[in-house]
Amino acid sequence: MDTSKTSFFLFSVLCSLQLVGAARPGKQQRSCPTPCECEQEGMLVRVDCSDRALTSLPRNLSIFTSYLDLSMNNITNLPSNVMHNLHFLEELRLAGNDLTYIPKGAFAGLGSLKVLMLQNNLLRQVPSEALHNLRSLQSLRLDANHISYVPPSSFNGLFSLRHLWLDDNSLTEIPVRALESLSALQAMTLALNKIHHIPDYAFRNLSSLVVLHLHNNRIYSLGKKCFDGLHSLETLDLNYNNLDEFPAAIKTLKNLKELGFHSNNIKSIPEQAFIGNPSLITIHFYDNPIQHVGRSAFQHLPELRTLILNGASQITEFPDLTGTTSLESLTLTGAQLVYLPSAVCTQLPNLQVLDLSYNHIKDLPSFSGCQRLQKIDLRHNEVYEIRSTTFQQLVGLRSLDLAWNKIAVIHPNSFSSLPSLIKLDLSSNHLTSFPVTGLHGLTHLKLTGNSALQDLIPSEHFPKLRVMEMPYAYQCCAFAVCDNLKHSGQMNKDENSSADDFYRKDIGLLHLQDDRDFEDFLLDFEEDVKVLHSVQCTPSAGPFKPCDHLFGSWLTRTGVWLIVLLSFVCNALVIATVFRPLSYVPSIKLLIGLIAIMNTLMGLSSGVLATVDALTFGNFAQYGAWWESGVGCQITGFLSVFAAETSIFLLTVAALERGFSIKCTTKFETKSSFINVKLSIVFCFLLSIVIAVSPLLSGSTYGTSPLCFPLLFGDPSSMGFMVALVLLNSLCFLVMTIAYTKLYCSLEKGELENIWDCSMVKHIALLLFTNCILYCPVAFLSFSSLLNLTFISPEVNKSILLLIIPLPACLNPLLYILFNPHFKEDIGSLKNGDILWSRSRQTSLASVSSEDAEKQSCDSTQALVTFANSSISYDLPATSSSSSYQMTNNYKLSAVAFVPCH
């Protein structure tokens, strides 16, 4: 009664003053404090003094102030009766100041105050005396302070209080006595405190409370009757606490609609756990170490719309959902489910979203009874077969995710009755074929990770397809990706990553916990006409994943064939002359012969690629997947790496052998044993085998590209392998260069011409120079890729792989044939049937006639070196007794004839 009289009195005064204000306009505007901003609302004034660095309340506030914002200042105290004349003030904001204490009477006279904000201050307890008799107060914010104590009389007289914030403080218990007087309270948050226990009848007088937040505390136990009296409670948040047991006290909350107790330590959900909560709409209890769930736990919840159970790793049985007929979204991930009951759709006729990912489901029932299903997520399970009835007549299904299963069999009509399906993910399965019936409406298709799925997919079955991921780039050729690449170049990664966002359209079906995939399939087809005619397909085709020809140009094709033919012919001649029957092979010739064999293998690997290019000419996409994933490509890649590495290693041994040989000769020392050279050769072969096999043992293969060779860019493992090879080979070339530089520097001018077999020294030097020059582009591109320098086009990389790398296979034998006099001698001996090194068998060859020497020497002189009482410096075996050599181990000559250098 008194309140009505007071309100009538204030209304009368307001009307009178309004008439006065109408006669004297602008009066109130002039009374606005200097640092503040004021706004007229009829007779009343809104004053904004926020973030003005104030240390006290501004003066000259209008008595008609209805809104006063003093937040984000430096106010440290509020004197008593400082606002006693602000009878019309309805909202007062003091947040973000330095208030540590509010005295009694600080809010005296604020009979109309409805909203009081005191958050983000330094209060250590609720200012109980200051709050007394704020009868109109409806919202009180005390959050983000340091409050650890709430006096029992804190809220006395706050009969109209509807909302109370006490979160983010230091409370250790529920302020039971202080809350007893708040019978009109509708929403309260005590979150982000240090509360350990909720006692019985903690909220017994809060019969009007609708929302209660207790999350992010340290609650480990609940009284069995702690929620008694909360007859109107609809939302209860117990998330992020330390609860060990299911909160059985909720059984008294008959009107509860939203319940959250996720991220606790609850291990079990008992039978009929929610029997007293028939109004529940949403339950969140994921991220609990749940080991057991009663089969009847979720029965008879007719209003339940969403059920989320993530991370319940010990659940092995699908819950019985009898009576929970309104469920629209069911998420049960990270459990141990092995099967689904056949009656799942009978119990859930209104189900729209089903997420059973990360389980162990092996067999799927028929979902034909779930006519409202729009999204099914079954990724990361163990499903083997999709039958024709599994998804039959799901006319509303728009997204189906079956990735990371073991699906090997899909019935041809499995998707024939899914007219609304626009997103299908079957990536990382064991598919060998893919049915296309009924998928004409697809816009997103993912088949990547099915290595056995090598057939091309006809594009005419997917007229609306916009985004696709295939096992092989060649399968993108059918969707004109090659043609697009010719005009637009390689697609930008940022554009690819945002392409899905361009198509997304949220139709607001449900608020899901994870809407990343759900929104991805909801497309707007009418936004841009240009987008309708483009297909984003990955992995994209290109020079290393060609659609038409393995070799991109006729220049490359002709060059490869020329290298192959020359390597076969020239290396065959070198091998025939070096390894002639009944002839002794010295160490340096043995190395040259082995290098020729390796060069032949390199030519063979290039010949295989050239043959594949010829056989698949103009239609490589049809056979590309079969070729690069087959054994033939693996063998070709192995041979190319093995041959290339062995050639470099043998060339390194040859360079070192020449250096040691010259050193022994010039110092009249006995040569090192031939056994050391043989051991080095064996080591080279073993090291090359290890290098060539390592891509297979490390999990990667040579089939990353149809060239069957590790790429200089792209896949990190392949690029890392190539960079390691380049570093190793560069080290070999460095060792060879140092050895030969040291060799030439140690010899006096003209001394090399007097050394036996100096032609071999010069030949190895020529090989070193040629191979080093040819290897520079490979090293440069490898390090460019490592540094992400992309100024070199993939076409150039491809040409280097096809032409530069195998080029030594034909140049090495050509250099030997054209410039080494040993070849002329050996080919003549081979032609006439003579035995190699016949001069070493005849003791009469103490000297060579001047006429013969003149024919063989470019300077018409004979190079002779006399070794007095020293062993002959040929590379004969240490214990040779074969009659084919016709000489003894320590056979001595007074003078020896030598093959000239020129």
Swiss-Prot record:
Q: Which residues form the signal peptide?
A: 1-22
In the record for this protein, the LRR repeats are positioned at: 41-61, 62-85, 86-109, 111-133, 134-157, 159-181, 182-205, 207-229, 230-253, 254-276, 278-300, 302-324, 325-347, 348-372, 374-393, 394-417, 418-441, 598-619
Cysteine-cysteine disulfides: C32-C38, C36-C49, C345-C370, C476-C537, C633-C708
Where mainly located? Answer: membrane
Which regions face the Cytoplasmic side of the membrane? Answer: 580-589, 656-678, 740-763, 820-902
All copies of the LRRNT domain together span 32-61
- GO molecular function annotation: protein-hormone receptor activity; transmembrane signaling receptor activity
Recite the UniProt keywords alphabetically.
Answer: Cell membrane, Disulfide bond, G-protein coupled receptor, Glycoprotein, Golgi apparatus, Leucine-rich repeat, Membrane, Receptor, Repeat, Signal, Transducer, Transmembrane, Transmembrane helix
Q: How does it sit in the membrane?
A: Multi-pass membrane protein
Asked if the record carries the keyword Nucleotide-binding, the reply is no
Classification via InterPro entries: GPCR_Rhodpsn, GPCR_Rhodpsn_7TM, Gphrmn_rcpt_fam, Leu-rich_rpt, Leu-rich_rpt_typical-subtyp, LRR_dom_sf, LRRNT
Is Chaperone a UniProt keyword of this protein?
Answer: no
Q: Which family does it belong to?
A: Belongs to the G-protein coupled receptor 1 family.
Which PANTHER family does the entry mention? Answer: G-PROTEIN COUPLED RECEPTORS FAMILY 1 PROFILE DOMAIN-CONTAINING PROTEIN, GLYCOPROTEIN HORMONE RECEPTOR
Q: What does this protein do?
A: Receptor for R-spondins that potentiates the canonical Wnt signaling pathway and acts as a stem cell marker of the intestinal epithelium and the hair follicle. Upon binding to R-spondins (RSPO1, RSPO2, RSPO3 or RSPO4), associates with phosphorylated LRP6 and frizzled receptors that are activated by extracellular Wnt receptors, triggering the canonical Wnt signaling pathway to increase expression of target genes. In contrast to classical G-protein coupled receptors, does not activate heterotrimeric G-proteins to transduce the signal.
Task: From the Swiss-Prot or TrEMBL record, give the protein name.
Answer: Leucine-rich repeat-containing G-protein coupled receptor 5
User: Gene name?
Assistant: lgr5
